[in-house]
């Protein structure tokens, strides 16, 4: 009888745990929690142990970069931070399409799932939008909003195109821990920074603080270019410089396989077809990596494949089923549905507009 009671108790505990996990999954689906929170093991909560290895499951071919990004995010947990100072100032640089943004997003997602961040949300500021002194008010409003937005990461893009005066403000945030404002500002009911004019007003804002956020700069250039724009004191305040590497052929093959697997799932869920592709198709997709686009060329190729197959499905009102096989020929990719004769895949796509 006691055994039966204990068994029922155990079943009750398991049911409660599963209900709790399901609630977490629902919150993930609604965007209230980072993906992966429900499946995080208890021993991983609050820990960086094995975090880089987990990121490398989805971020392929950039192992050293992932290690350096995780190290950069961990640094303030080891060194500690003071007050509203920046948690860490980080430069992520490398060629386009080498996974800089994806690696940061995955690191933040897993950190949030482990309770190391409150959320994986990031505020992004495109500094190219502030090229001259006339954009000062807009810059200060956007900077203040980003630093007070939900999440603990503020990302800065295209610092190379920003007005030097605004870069000095960012430098002050990193070096001095706050930046003084030349005019008196107030925060209105909507949380927007507005000029207070000449009148003395309660609650005036005279400086901007980093609010304990990670300040992360993206660039295609390294430390020297950063010093040219911001100065040596700013570069000295940068805690970590993380650089991506060119993809090896093996890494590109793995990335292509990952993209094709995702494509197969999409084709199955959207078009109701089973997609098959051999090593030659994987190599064809891998070869779409270019100096200009990097690995984005692989994603673009898979998007074209999906659009071409969608066009094929749209040519008939009957619901198609079965297997569509992709093959690579010297002239390009070919497809065959249920063993039919292979046909050119990309000829299904509408002709590009040329303006003629």
Residue spans for each PLM region:
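Pre-Walker A (pre-P-loop) alpha-helix and adjacent loop at the N terminus of AAA/AAA+ ATPase modules
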Residues: 45-88, 307-314
């Amino acid at each position: 009888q006691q055994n039966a009671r204990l068994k029922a108790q155990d079943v009750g505990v398991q049911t409660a745990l599963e209900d709790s996990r399901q609630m977490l999954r629902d919150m993930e689906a609604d965007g209230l929690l980072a993906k992966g929170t429900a499946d995080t093991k208890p021993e991983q909560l609050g820990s960086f142990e094995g975090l880089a290895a987990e990121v490398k499951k989805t971020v392929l071919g950039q192992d050293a970069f992932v290690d350096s990004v995780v190290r950069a995010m961990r640094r303030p947990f080891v060194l500690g931070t003071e007050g509203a100072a920046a948690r860490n100032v980080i430069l992520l640089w490398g060629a386009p399409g080498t996974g800089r943004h994806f690696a940061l997003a995955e690191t933040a997602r897993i950190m949030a799932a482990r309770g190391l961040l409150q959320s994986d949300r990031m505020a992004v500021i495109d500094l190219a939008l502030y090229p001259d002194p006339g954009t000062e008010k807009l810059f200060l409003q956007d900077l203040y909003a980003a630093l007070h937005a939900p999440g603990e990461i503020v990302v800065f893009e295209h610092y190379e195109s920003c007005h030097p005066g605004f870069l000095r403000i960012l430098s002050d945030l990193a070096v001095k821990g706050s930046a003084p404002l030349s005019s008196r500002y107030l925060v209105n009911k909507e949380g927007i920074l507005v000029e207070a004019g000449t009148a003395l007003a309660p609650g005036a804002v005279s400086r901007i603080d980093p609010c304990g956020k990670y300040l992360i700069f993206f660039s295609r250039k390294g430390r020297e270019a950063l010093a040219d724009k911001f100065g040596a004191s700013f570069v000295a305040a940068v805690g970590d410089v993380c650089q991506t590497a060119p993809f090896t052929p093996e890494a590109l093959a793995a990335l292509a396989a990952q993209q094709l697997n995702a494509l197969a799932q999409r084709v199955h869920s959207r078009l109701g077809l089973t997609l098959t592709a051999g090593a030659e198709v994987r190599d064809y997709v891998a070869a779409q990596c270019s100096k200009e686009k990097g690995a984005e060329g692989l994603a673009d190729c898979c998007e074209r494949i999906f659009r071409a197959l969608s066009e094929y499905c749209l040519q008939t009102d009957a619901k198609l089923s079965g297997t569509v096989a992709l093959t690579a020929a010297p002239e390009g990719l070919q497809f065959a549905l249920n063993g039919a004769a292979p046909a050119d895949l990309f000829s299904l796509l509408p002709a590009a507009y040329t303006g003629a």
